Amino acid sequence: MLYAVLMYPLAYFYLRGVMFPQSYPDWGMPVFAALFMVYVDCAARAAHRTAAKETPLWAVCWMALAVAYPLYGYQPGPLGDWQWPAWHLFAVWYVLARCGMLAQGQSGSLAPLDALAGFVLLPFGNFFLRARTVFAALRTHLQDRTGTRKVLRLIVTAAVTLALCGVAWGLLAAADANFAALGQQVSDWWNRLLNNVRFIDQLMYILLSLPVGAWLYGLVGGSLRRKAPPTTAQQCAAVLENCRVVPRTTAVAAVMALCGVYALFFAVQAGEWLAAAPLGLDAPDTAAFAVNGFWELLKILLLNFAVLAGIQFFGRAPLPKALAAVFCGFGVAFAALAAGKLAVYVTLCALTPRRFTAAWCLFVLAVCAVLALVRVFKPIPAAKLAIFAAAVSFTLLCCVNVKQRVIDVNLARYEAGIDEELDWGVLWECGYQESAAQ
């Protein structure tokens, strides 16, 4: 009952401080994160729920993102577009970890199912849990103190009294002008209240906070009511046993074919470099090399991970260790090639917010490629480590003043004569005019 009631002001503060932060633009997000963490932790302790070992990591990442917002605002470029969803994702993951609702007991390869449970199954499956909890507590309290008959008697008494007073007021207003004027004053006050913009604004926030609070309490309360996650690792393993339809020969043939294509690609790349090395590359040719195919290389890495995941979940047998090592080695090579392209391009054309984002994407995929290669020889929780690397690196990047860093680098290159002119589009995107005015 207590936690159900506390969710009402907490949801209202989320609307005013996070979703529509006009009232608390600087500190609403970190304050809500701190209050919600305390709320979840106290509720979990009251339910005697053991937290996952990774819970502090998600708490730190979530709070760091919350604190970074009032310091630097949203980062420019795609990175800023991802901050808002990431902040909510970390919040949901913290709740799941603290309440013991992760499918594997920890983050891992079933993370998509955890996201489905955290955003859909638990909150919407328990959407009316708060209302039921409050009404049940009130009904029990009233029954214990007055009994059902007395409650009904009070309701009937109040209705009859209001009806009689209304009739009497109308008759007396017709009998005396001053009494009628008093009634008109009360009516005018009520109309002014209902037509007051501030009152309507507060009322709308209160009404909007009701479904928000129902969702939040459904997530927390629904997690604490369950003894096991909506989908467990054992259930997934049992289902996947019936889905292992890919023969080993098919998997081996497909991976060997991909390795052949990759080997041919690197042979062509090496031939191009050997042919061009004696002649040298001018700046336009170097820039063309750097920019061409960067995102395609990242897509190749994603393709490799999809192939490995498909074999892991749907293959009847794992790949031979040597073939798996070669395939994962190509992934590391693609990541290294993409890193070289990005480094050359940044050296030639300076930093932009999008290149910061590209560097982060490349870093995460490179870490995944290395973990996949290590996992061939040593059983490590590669998916868990990859998720941690993505979350921590994204948080650290959001805690850096990317806007000022981009401005400083571009101005330094211009003053040193490296760039003939400033890229005003990039500078304006990073708020250079505002910085100069200050």
Describe each model-derived feature in a short phrase.
Residues 395-420:
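Hydrophobic alpha-helical transmembrane segments in integral membrane proteins
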Residues 259, 380-403:
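Internal/C-terminal transmembrane anchor helices
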Residues 149-155, 317-322, 377-391:
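Membrane-interfacial entry segments at the cytosolic side of transmembrane helices
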Residues 170-187, 264-280, 336-344:
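Membrane-helix interface motif
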Residues 190-207, 282-302, 351-361:
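Short aromatic-rich membrane-water interface segments that cap or initiate transmembrane helices
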Residues 326-376:
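Membrane-embedded alpha-helical segments of integral membrane proteins
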Residues 83-88, 199-238, 242, 251, ...:
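Terminal, non-globular segments
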Residues 15-23, 27-181, 204-227:
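Transmembrane-helix bundle segments that line or gate the permeation/cavity pathway
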